[in-house]
Every structure is written in C-alpha cells, then in structure tokens.
Amino acid sequence: MRTSIYNIETRIGINGTPYIMEVSPRGGGNRLAEMLRFATGVDLIINAVRAAVGDDVDDIRQKPYSGYWAEVILHSDTDGYFKNLVIDDEFYRSHVVQKDLWVKENDRVSVFKGANDAIGTLVLKFESEKQLVEALREQNCWMKINVE
C-alpha cells in the first residue's frame, strides 16, 4: 500500500457522517487516469505498473492542466439498432481528441439506464471553460447518435 493508485469512494449518510464505501488498488472509473494524462502529461497507469514491479516511477506531481477537458460517455436515447455516430466536422477537428466507439452498425443498443448501456466515449479539449460548458450543454447541436 505504499505506492499505487487507489480508488476511494465515500458517501455522506443522512446523519451527516461520512462513510468509506470502497478502497481498492485501481484508478477511478470513466478513464480518469487517462484524462489526467491528456490534461497534464502525467501517466499514472504506466507509473502504477512501474511501482508494482519495483521500478522507479517518473515525475508524479500536480501539474497545471493544458486546456479544458471533458469526457463524454456515449449512449442511446432509445432501444434499437445502432446505425452511426455523426459529429459536426468543424467541431470534430477543433475539439475531439479521441473517439472510442464500442459498437458497430446494426449492434443492438439499449436506452441508457447505467454504465453497462454506454456505447463509447469521446475525449474533448477546449480553449476555455465557457466553450466546454456550452459544448456539453448543446451536445445535440454537434453530435447525433442514430438508432433504428
């Protein structure tokens, strides 16, 4: 337990008392360690492996973020068969750093009820917080998930 990445999840009870729900030797969910690598250049995953095998780790420290970052969890609004993901060309060129689609055309998809209904992710980068907030609020203006 000396050197690693740990996921610690807590909850505040209705009585105001904090409770530890989980402590596990893993990075947080939704690609958090990868998002930190994009934003800061610090690779927690490689360094966790290095530490696990007794190798020296690279410089791990709090670094300023380069830009404003978001991860969008892709999901369907309806049950059906996935047709395609359409992203506005200009938006794609300007902001999409990585697209990871987990389904292919005609795969069965379900309306989003939980993490197991996700169909992929987008990693986005912006020049300002205002751009980021607007893009996340107006996703239907630059992205469409087509399902039949």
Give the role of each language-model region:
Residues 1-7, 24-79:
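Active-site "cap" helix and flanking loop/linker of ATP-utilizing ligase/carboxylase catalytic domains
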Residues 2, 17, 93-95:
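A generic structural signal for alpha->beta connector loops
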Residues 11-15:
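Short beta-strand micro-motifs enriched in acidic
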Residues 16, 36-40, 86-89:
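Solvent-exposed, flexible loop/coil residues
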Residues 19-22:
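Protein kinase-like catalytic core scaffold
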Residues 49-148:
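Peripheral (often C-terminal) accessory segments that flank ATP-dependent C-N-forming ligase machineries
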